[in-house]
Swiss-Prot record:
Protein name as annotated: Antigen Sm21.7
UniProt binding sites for Ca(2+): 50, 52, 54, 56, 61
UniProt key word Calcium: yes
Gene expressing this chain: SM21.7
Organism: Schistosoma mansoni (Blood fluke)
Short name of one Pfam family: EF-hand_7
Residue ranges the record marks as coiled coil: none
GO biological process: microtubule-based process
SMART domains: Dynein_light, EFh
Length: 184
């Protein structure tokens, strides 16, 4: 489930214009209202970005204001566009998503990565090796710092993560929890 911050970021990225990479504050407020976000919080966030009071928020201002990496937000924006266009791929066979804040294209990438590692190492019953390899590969592909857990029964979890960097899924008889925490 997306947090209010993730919904806000997704709303901004959806409205972002290609040419000049700006969003008008009025359009952002209107879209956030439609998404039923807390407008008091939205207005506080907008005030972080529009410091020059020109009623526009550039992509650079937005990322700087929230401490987000521009290159990662461009990737997230491309994922959003893929979903909106209907060109997204299906999840790998045998994978079911329990919860995720990742856009569907990234869910496909991450679950396929796990499935490949799991099936490669499956002959070795040491799940620790699978988890360590999966964590290392997530960090190589998506940056540091990832946390990975594998469980076989019920679980309860509460954790903080970077926007759009959390996934919980089941494959075979394993439940995998993975999320990225800030590295700074």
């Amino acid at each position: 489930m997306d947090s209010p911050m993730e919904k806000f970021i997704q709303t901004y990225l959806t409205l972002l214009r290609d040419g000049d990479e700006t969003v008008e504050t009025s359009k952002l407020s209107e879209s956030c209202r439609k998404e039923k976000l807390d407008m008091k919080q939205v207005n506080e966030w907008i005030a972080l970005f529009d410091v020059d009071k020109d009623q526009k928020i550039t992509f650079e201002e937005f990322c700087r204001g929230l401490g987000l990496k521009q290159n990662e937000m461009r990737i997230e924006r491309n994922h959003i566009k893929t979903v909106q266009s209907g060109r997204e791929q299906s999840l790998p066979e045998g994978v079911s998503i329990i919860a995720s804040t990742m856009p569907k294209p990234k869910q496909v990438e991450v679950t396929q990565l796990f499935k490949d590692i799991y099936n490669e190492v499956k002959k070795d019953p040491d799940m620790n090796k699978v988890v360590k390899t999966f964590k290392s590969e997530l960090e190589r592909r998506y940056g540091r710092v990832w946390q990975v857990n594998a469980v076989t029964h019920s679980y309860w979890a509460s954790f903080s993560h970077e926007p759009f960097q959390s996934i919980q899924f089941q494959y075979d008889n394993k439940i995998i929890l993975a999320w990225r925490t800030p590295s700074n």
